[in-house]
């Protein structure tokens, strides 16, 4: 059963320490039920998952969005075949059930990354090659029924941001926390990857 935990809101941006504090605030019974973490690859979340030995499933949407941001139209136009090739290899790596069948694709992608002229794109590809297993844990642990994206959470956050903007801000973090809690209770559920519903507890 999936659940939405009551919100924890702190000042400042997203940080490693902030995520550590957020997870430390969870009760031990809840922490003990967590087996995996689906995230966008933020260092703080990766650190938390490693420290707590949780399975880490990285978001496919953020991966391809990152590639698009770093693969400019000019670069794509000049290296069309190469761009299509690494895109195809990545999709094969993150969707093929058999690990043995993708080893050659991982090796090919590693070689392609060495010759990429764009530093930013090369960095993303090398990062993917190092951590490709994190994008496949939904296949490795099918019994957990892990989503491959964080889209449901991103959508919920967007809804909260939209109504916060309409409210024109809050005087204190406490009042904001109360408002977000009420918003989540009113929403009642959120669809996760099209299969599971969650309830606020």
Residue ranges and their predicted role:
Residues 54-59, 137-200:
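Amphipathic alpha-helical/coiled-coil segments positioned at domain termini
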Residues 36-84:
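Conserved beta-strand -> loop -> alpha-helix junction used to position metal-binding or nucleic-acid-contacting
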Residues 79-117, 129-130, 160, 175-190:
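Charged alpha-helix within mobile-element recombinases
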């Amino acid at each position: 059963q999936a659940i939405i935990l009551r919100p924890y809101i702190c000042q400042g941006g997203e940080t490693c320490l902030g995520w550590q504090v957020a997870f430390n605030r969870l009760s031990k019974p809840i922490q003990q039920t967590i087996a995996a973490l689906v995230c966008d690859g933020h260092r703080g979340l990766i650190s938390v998952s490693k420290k707590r030995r949780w399975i880490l499933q990285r978001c496919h949407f953020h991966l391809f969005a990152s590639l698009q941001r770093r693969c400019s139209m000019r670069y794509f136009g000049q290296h069309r075949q190469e761009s299509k090739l690494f895109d195809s290899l990545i999709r094969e790596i993150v969707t093929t059930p058999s690990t043995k069948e993708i080893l050659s694709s991982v090796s090919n992608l590693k070689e392609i990354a060495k010759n990429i002229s764009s530093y930013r794109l090369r960095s993303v590809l090398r990062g993917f090659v190092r951590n490709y297993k994190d994008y496949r844990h939904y296949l490795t642990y099918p019994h957990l029924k892990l989503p491959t994206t964080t889209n449901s959470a991103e959508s919920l956050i967007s809804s909260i941001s939209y109504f916060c903007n309409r409210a024109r801000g809050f005087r204190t973090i406490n009042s904001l926390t109360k408002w977000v809690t009420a918003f989540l209770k009113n929403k009642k559920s959120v669809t996760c990857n099209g299969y599971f519903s969650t309830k606020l507890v």
